[in-house]
């Protein structure tokens, strides 16, 4: 079985990576101190990456408030479900609210509308 994680955690990880990518881009800009224009371009791109991560964090925060909160039957901790199937944030137990999918092997394609 492939390694899955909850959708909320995936999006949060993406936003965190944008922050670090922004810092790395700005750090690369420091090496071009002799060219003010080139250094400024790298600094602006880095700040834009950090601002984009802020927007992603805000979006996932708003999405998280609308997610269905359930108690995982495996670890008995509260977790949130986005879509028809998702994973527990704590123990990676496959979770679903759809009675038709109970007992089936976990597959993220169940969340696509073409199904």
Swiss-Prot record:
The keyword Methyltransferase does not apply. Its main location: membrane. It holds the Pfam family DUF2614. InterPro entries: UPF0295 (IPR020912). It is found in: Cell membrane. The chain crosses the membrane at residues 18-38, 41-61. The keyword Heme does not apply. It is a multi-pass membrane protein. Keywords: Cell membrane, Membrane, Transmembrane, Transmembrane helix. GO terms for cellular component: plasma membrane. Disulfide bonds: none annotated. NCBIfam families: PRK02935.1. Belongs to the UPF0295 family. This is UPF0295 protein BLi00901/BL05075. It comes from Bacillus licheniformis (strain ATCC 14580 / DSM 13 / JCM 2505 / CCUG 7422 / NBRC 12200 / NCIMB 9375 / NCTC 10341 / NRRL NRS-1264 / Gibson 46).
């Amino acid at each position: 079985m492939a390694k899955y994680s909850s959708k909320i955690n995936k999006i949060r990880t993406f936003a965190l990576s944008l922050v670090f990518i922004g810092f790395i881009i700005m750090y690369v800009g420091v090496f071009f101190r002799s060219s003010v224009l080139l250094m400024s371009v790298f600094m602006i791109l880095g700040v834009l990456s950090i601002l984009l991560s802020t927007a992603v964090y805000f979006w996932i925060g708003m999405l998280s408030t609308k997610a269905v909160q359930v108690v995982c039957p495996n670890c008995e901790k509260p977790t949130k479900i986005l879509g028809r199937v998702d994973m527990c944030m704590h123990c990676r137990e496959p979770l679903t609210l759809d009675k038709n999918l109970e007992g089936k092997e976990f597959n993220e394609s169940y969340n696509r509308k073409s199904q």
